[in-house]
């Protein structure tokens, strides 16, 4: 299509595309145009590659007026690699935009404004990604094996030899991993490498669709010794993961403020950003405002990431998780840290929980809720139903709920139920910049019983 414009960019969408609006001939608002690479405040020309009746998708051609927040991307693969979408935007502006997304979703989806907007939780902009899922593909046209993230909006693998958001020692492994996979007999049968960086160990989980030969195994052992990594193998589903070499190392991360060491498997859900996780932990416990002797409930507890720090404050804590394997590991982690006397764990499907299920747990003074992207709809509906029953049922509800979210849209949906139907107020909310240079919005919110 021909070059069009000029166009004023007024905002970013949830994929970090610049958003502008055309005007009809009569001066009324027309189509919305989404422009890859454009920033709010910029005046640009663009070329559309997809046109629909109500919107167009386009690529940036020229910047006629540049945003003061535009910066030079640090990574030379930015724009091709799909791992990041906002490196061309100043870090402070990234956080401000994420805060605006959170507040807009709360207002537009739930008609809510927090009483207090919390100061954003932020940390290092680079080298923060301690977990990553890398795609592996043999591409003859590229001269061999590629290991990396997908290209932006594509199933192709980016031809990348470094990554600025991975820890430097992991970034340095990208080229050696290409060479390693190229030497294996199953070069065409290894679609993925999952990276998990612990306190002292870097684990690489190889998804293998065929057994390794003895020569393959020798290659892996030599690579592990040379690069100080630990290989795990995954022949089928996530439950089939097992350590291959070396066997005398354990993956852990630490929470120094609480004196806690957390063993984990490389396929367990753990936070990508260890530094932010520690700050988030402190903020969450401060917002819970629990007192020694309080009973606390941790929903979607995983391996005990929040449960165990809560228990160090002299509280009795119950963690509930939908995965039997994670529930078992949470209990083991409590025992490892000498907190099994302060914690109990149960496995429940929290996506199908009812008001009666919640009531059967008994009363807890404070709740912490940390769901996946789907949010906590069933839990929120159960809370609303107990509130509406009144009497003893309503008395079971906590005075405060701290909600950690990785999807502002589902947070807003659940917040609407908690406030408009369950009698809570949204006391505060703010963003957590867990994923710098991406459009991913993590946040924390506090609800207090009115």
UniProtKB/Swiss-Prot annotation:
Active-site residues are 406 (nucleophile)
Q: Which GO terms describe its molecular function?
A: 4 iron, 4 sulfur cluster binding; iron ion binding; RNA binding; rRNA (uridine-C5-)-methyltransferase activity
Sections of the chain in a coiled coil? none
- Residues the record lists as binding S-adenosyl-L-methionine: 271, 300, 305, 321, 349, 370
Q: Which EC class, in a word?
A: transferase
Q: What PROSITE patterns does the record tag this protein with?
A: SAM_MT_RNA_M5U, TRAM, TRMA_2
What chemistry does it catalyse, as a reaction equation?
Answer: uridine(1939) in 23S rRNA + S-adenosyl-L-methionine = 5-methyluridine(1939) in 23S rRNA + S-adenosyl-L-homocysteine + H(+)
List GO BP terms, alphabetically: rRNA base methylation
Segments forming domain TRAM = 1-62
Residue numbers binding [4Fe-4S] cluster? 75, 81, 84, 163
EC id = 2.1.1.190
Pfam families on file: TRAM (PF01938), tRNA_U5-meth_tr (PF05958)
List the cysteine pairs that form cystine. none
Alphabetized, the UniProt keywords read: 4Fe-4S, Iron, Iron-sulfur, Metal-binding, Methyltransferase, rRNA processing, S-adenosyl-L-methionine, Transferase
Give the matching HAMAP family.
Answer: 23SrRNA_methyltr_RlmD (MF_01010)
Please describe what this protein does. Answer: Catalyzes the formation of 5-methyl-uridine at position 1939 (m5U1939) in 23S rRNA.
What family, per the record?
Answer: Belongs to the class I-like SAM-binding methyltransferase superfamily. RNA M5U methyltransferase family. RlmD subfamily.
- Protein's UniProt name: 23S rRNA (uracil(1939)-C(5))-methyltransferase RlmD
Organism listed in the record: Ralstonia nicotianae (strain ATCC BAA-1114 / GMI1000) (Ralstonia solanacearum)
From the UniProt record, report the name of the gene that encodes this protein.
rlmD
């Amino acid at each position: 299509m021909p070059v069009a414009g000029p166009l004023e960019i007024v905002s970013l969408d949830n994929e970090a595309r610049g958003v502008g609006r055309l005007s009809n001939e009569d001066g009324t608002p027309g189509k919305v145009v989404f422009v890859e690479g454009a920033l709010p405040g910029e005046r640009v020309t663009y070329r559309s590659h997809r046109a629909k009746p109500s919107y167009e998708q386009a690529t940036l051609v020229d910047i006629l007026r540049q945003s003061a927040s535009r910066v030079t991307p640090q990574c030379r693969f930015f724009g091709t690699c799909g791992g990041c979408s906002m490196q061309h935007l100043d870090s402070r502006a990234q956080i401000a935009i994420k805060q605006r997304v959170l507040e807009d979703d709360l207002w537009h989806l739930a008609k809510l404004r927090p009483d207090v907007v919390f100061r954003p939780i932020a940390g290092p902009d680079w080298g923060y990604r301690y977990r990553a899922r890398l795609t592996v593909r043999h591409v003859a046209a590229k001269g061999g094996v590629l290991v990396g993230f997908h290209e932006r909006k594509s199933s192709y693998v980016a031809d990348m030899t470094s990554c600025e958001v991975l820890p430097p020692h992991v970034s340095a492994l990208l080229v050696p991993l290409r060479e390693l996979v190229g030497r294996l007999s199953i070069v065409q049968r290894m679609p993925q490498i999952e990276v998990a960086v612990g306190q002292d160990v870097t684990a690489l989980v190889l998804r293998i669709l065929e057994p390794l030969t003895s020569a393959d195994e020798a290659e892996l052992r030599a690579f592990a010794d040379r690069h100080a990594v630990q290989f795990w193998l995954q022949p089928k589903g996530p439950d089939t993961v097992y350590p291959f070499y070396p066997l005398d190392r354990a993956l852990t991360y630490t929470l120094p403020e609480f004196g806690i060491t957390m063993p984990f498997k490389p396929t367990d859900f753990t936070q990508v950003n260890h530094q932010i996780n520690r700050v988030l932990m402190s903020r969450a416990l401060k917002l819970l405002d629990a007192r020694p002797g309080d009973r606390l409930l941790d929903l979607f507890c995983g391996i005990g990431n929040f449960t165990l720090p809560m228990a160090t404050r002299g509280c009795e804590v119950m963690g509930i998780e939908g995965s039997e394997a994670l529930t078992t590991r949470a209990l083991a982690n409590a025992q490892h840290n000498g907190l099994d006397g302060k914690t109990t764990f149960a496995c429940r499907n929290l996506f199908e929980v009812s008001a009666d299920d919640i009531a059967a747990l008994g009363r807890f003074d404070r709740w912490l809720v940390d769901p996946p992207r789907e949010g906590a709809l069933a839990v929120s509906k159960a809370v609303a139903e107990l509130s509406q029953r009144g009497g003893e049922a309503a008395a079971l509800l906590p005075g405060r709920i701290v909600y950690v979210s990785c999807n502002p849209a589902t947070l807003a949906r659940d917040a609407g139920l908690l406030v408009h139907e369950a009698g809570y107020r949204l006391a505060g909310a703010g963003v957590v910049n867990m994923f710098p240079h991406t459009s991913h919005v993590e946040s924390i919110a506090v609800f207090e019983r009115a």
